[in-house]
Amino acid sequence: MSEILPYSDEKMGHYGSDGDVGQISFSCRLQDTSSFFGGNQQKRPPKLGQIGRAKRVVIEDDRIDEVLKGVSDKSPSGV
């Protein structure tokens, strides 16, 4: 995982006049980005027939028939 490394005082951005006590860090750097950029290059894109197809879902609920029946019995309220 990447770590954010703090900058030293020389690389801090100063704002305001010299008498003001204000500093703001304007940059950060990442360490070990090889896993971020090279992680998924071995995975192939899906074939055209696979795009948009849902995986099979198994619903294990004893009262699913009652729930589905109740939804279809309800009539939409007047709009």
Swiss-Prot record:
Inhibitory domain: region residues: 43-69
Cell location: Nucleus; Cytoplasm, Cytosol
Record key words, sorted: Cytoplasm, Nucleus, Protein kinase inhibitor
Domain of life: Eukaryota
Pfam family, one: CaM-KIIN
InterPro entries: Camk2n
Main location group: nucleus
GO molecular function: protein kinase inhibitor activity
Single GO cellular component term: cytosol
Family stated for the protein in its record: Belongs to the CAMK2N family.
Physiological role: Potent and specific cellular inhibitor of CaM-kinase II (CAMK2). Traps Ca(2+)/calmodulin on CAMK2.
Protein's recorded name: Calcium/calmodulin-dependent protein kinase II inhibitor 2
Species this chain originates from: Xenopus tropicalis (Western clawed frog)
Gene designation per UniProt: camk2n2
